[in-house]
Structures are given as structure tokens and as C-alpha cells.
Amino acid sequence: MGGKTVTRADLAEAVYRKVGLSRTESAALVEMILDEVCDAIVNGETVKLSSFATFQVRDKNERIGRNPKTGEEVPILPRRVMTFKASNVLKQRILQEHQKRQGKTSK
């Protein structure tokens, strides 16, 4: 299933090719967008990108975990975690692409 990892530079290059901004402007635009998303998430805001996904910060309570080597109970401190929930549109696109690839390999 391996695929390429898309980097900030790849996103900037795509903006450059599709929008027609200079490479410098494209890179700056990508940075600005990512900075805005990061700032919102850090501030505890939910970021919803329609037809893509929702990013949300969630508080997790303290709980008891277990050291897998010793079996000893260990407290896991409360913390904040970020969640990513793909939209139904994105899930459908992933499923369709998977089915399309399966069809090619099975023939």
C-alpha cells in the first residue's frame, strides 16, 4: 500500500502549479494556512475543513495503566490529545480508490 509522504514543499509546489502564484508566494500561503490551523488547535478550537476532516483537542482524564513488562499498575496522567476525524466525503474517496486499485490487481 506504500505511498509517498506529502510535505509542505509538495503542497507549495501544487499551489504553484494549480493557482499560478510564484513559488515563494505559494510556500508562504501554505505556511500561513498551516499556522492558522495550528494556532486554532493549540487554542482548543475545533478546526473543520468541509469535505476533508475535523481536528479537535480532547481532554483525557487520569487513569490506571499497566506496565506490560512487569504488570505493575501505573497512573497515566491527564493530558490533552488531538483527534482527527475524516469526513464522510474523504472516507468515500478513500474507499473508491481502494476498490479501483483492487479491481486492477485482481484482473
Swiss-Prot record:
Annotated function: This protein is one of the two subunits of integration host factor, a specific DNA-binding protein that functions in genetic recombination as well as in transcriptional and translational control.
PANTHER family associated with the record: DNA-BINDING PROTEIN HU (PTHR33175), INTEGRATION HOST FACTOR SUBUNIT ALPHA (PTHR33175:SF2)
GO cellular component terms, A-Z: cytosol
Similarity-based family: Belongs to the bacterial histone-like protein family.
Native source organism of the sequence: Brucella canis (strain ATCC 23365 / NCTC 10854 / RM-666)
Stated name of the protein: Integration host factor subunit alpha
Superkingdom of the source species: Bacteria
Keywords annotated in UniProt: DNA recombination, DNA-binding, Transcription, Transcription regulation, Translation regulation
